[in-house]
């Protein structure tokens, strides 16, 4: 029996497992021939792109209802070590015991995490990096009306005006206005523009949305210090606030440190066109752990759901093909598209690495809802449809927006 072990139960991990099983079934093989195992600390696949929304406990899917029906074995445990020489992974189960899991091929799909700062008062920071973090923020916001009145009770400061910072800052306007009439949201960015990594294309739409929503933007400054009721910025400004959300900076999962391979500035593993980790036999990487090149566009893909899904599908197919002595397929993602939520102001959709705006406001918001609430969810209790959507060349659907904007494949 050959063994595929997938570390991580997010988008890349789930679709790696499904694609490996799809090839197994297409070749008429069983679990006794090719075993597929996913090891993940939690029981759920977290829909991480939605964690800026209210009620984040809804943003999860039981892994056993997705992968169980297709015969994927699941181990609930926190991975604490990877030995690529012995081809084993060590995971601590919930009862405190350690499981040693062997593999013939490994897919590291353990994702990424926010880089929290070493600042005075950092324990007062919130984040939406994990389901637990988003739930903590959500609970905190709901309790604000019960707190003692003060100048910063309904003021939120968001640090970092990148993709995540923009989504949570604009969403907080609506979430806070459900609690009080007089609210304030301040967006802090150390660089001189909002959405610095998004470029010029969507910036006019972003700036208009921030202005329309009344979000105060502080550029060229950083967070210096915080307490439970205020923050101090690098220019000396003190802002009374009860809520500070940190979104500035991401890095690949620390599990990449167990893999003796080249890594980029985000800690992602250097992979070849088949998502094999260069220089490390029998190890593949997918999703936010992989610095994968889009050959058609000549760019290393983003740490994003949009790229994690296809990477998982290609990696899962390739590890199975590798064990079956079949040809591997080169990773080829769909053309790059972004869809940025802007809270009550709508959204903006861009295409290409120049990120030219294609849709804005509420037409774009309709697409964002479709993506977040339908397309990125795996089929539950439906093995046939899951496998139909698996495989390296399974495409996302076409979107037909209401209005005059051309349809956009994402």
Give the positions of each predicted feature.
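Beta1-alpha1 glycine-rich phosphate/pyrophosphate-binding loop at the start
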Residues: 1-76, 167-198, 245, 408-410
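Short glycine-rich anion-binding loops that position phosphate/pyrophosphate groups of nucleotides
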Residues: 12, 111-114, 250-251, 345
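Internal hydrophobic alpha-helix adjacent to the cofactor/substrate pocket in enzyme cavities
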Residues: 17, 306-333
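A Rossmann-like FAD-binding core segment of flavoenzymes
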Residues: 35, 74-88, 101, 174-273, ...
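FAD-binding core/adjacent interface of flavoenzyme oxidoreductases
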Residues: 72-157, 245
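FAD-site-proximal beta/loop scaffold in flavoenzymes
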Residues: 123-150, 238-243, 247-310
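Rossmann-like NAD(P)H-binding beta-loop-alpha module
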Residues: 138-182
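C-terminal auxiliary extensions adjacent to catalytic cores
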Residues: 344-410
């Amino acid at each position: 029996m050959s063994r595929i072990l997938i570390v991580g139960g997010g988008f890349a991990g789930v679709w790696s497992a499904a694609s490996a099983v799809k090839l197994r079934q297409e070749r008429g093989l069983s679990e006794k021939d090719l075993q597929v195992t996913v090891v993940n600390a939690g029981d759920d696949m977290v829909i991480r792109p939605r964690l800026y929304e209210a009620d984040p406990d809804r943003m999860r899917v039981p892994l056993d209802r997705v992968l169980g029906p297709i015969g994927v074995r699941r181990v609930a445990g926190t991975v604490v070590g990877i030995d690529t020489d012995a081809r084993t992974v060590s995971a601590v189960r919930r009862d405190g015991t350690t499981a040693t899991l062997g593999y013939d091929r490994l897919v590291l799909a353990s994702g990424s995490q926010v880089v929290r700062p070493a600042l005075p008062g950092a324990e007062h920071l919130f984040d939406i990096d994990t389901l637990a973090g988003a739930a903590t923020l959500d609970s905190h916001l709901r309790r604000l009306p019960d707190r003692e009145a003060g100048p910063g009770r309904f003021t939120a400061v968001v640090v970092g005006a990148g993709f995540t910072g923009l989504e949570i800052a604009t969403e907080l306007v609506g979430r806070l206005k459900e609690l009080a009439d007089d609210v304030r949201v301040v967006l802090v960015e150390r660089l001189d523009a909002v959405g610095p990594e998004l470029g010029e294309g969507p910036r006019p739409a972003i700036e208009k949305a921030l202005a329309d929503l009344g979000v105060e933007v502080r550029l060229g400054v950083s967070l210096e210090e915080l307490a439970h009721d205020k923050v101090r910025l690098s220019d000396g400004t003190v802002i009374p606030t009860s809520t500070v959300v940190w979104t500035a900076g991401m890095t690949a999962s620390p599990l990449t440190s167990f893999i003796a391979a080249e890594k980029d500035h985000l800690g992602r593993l250097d992979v070849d066109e088949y998502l094999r980790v260069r220089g490390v036999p029998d190890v593949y990487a997918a999703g936010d752990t992989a610095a994968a090149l889009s050959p058609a566009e000549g760019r290393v893909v983003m740490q994003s759901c949009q790229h994690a899904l296809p990477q998982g599908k290609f990696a899962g197919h390739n590890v199975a093909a590798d064990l079956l002595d079949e040809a591997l397929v080169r990773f080829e993602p769909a053309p790059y598209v972004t869809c940025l939520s802007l809270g009550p102001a709508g959204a903006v959709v861009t295409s290409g690495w120049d990120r030219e705006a294609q849709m804005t406001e509420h037409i774009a918001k309709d697409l964002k809802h479709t993506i977040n609430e339908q397309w990125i969810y795996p089929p539950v209790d439906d093995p046939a449809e899951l496998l139909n959507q698996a495989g390296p060349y399974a495409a996302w659907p076409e979107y037909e927006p209401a209005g005059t904007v051309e349809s956009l494949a994402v």
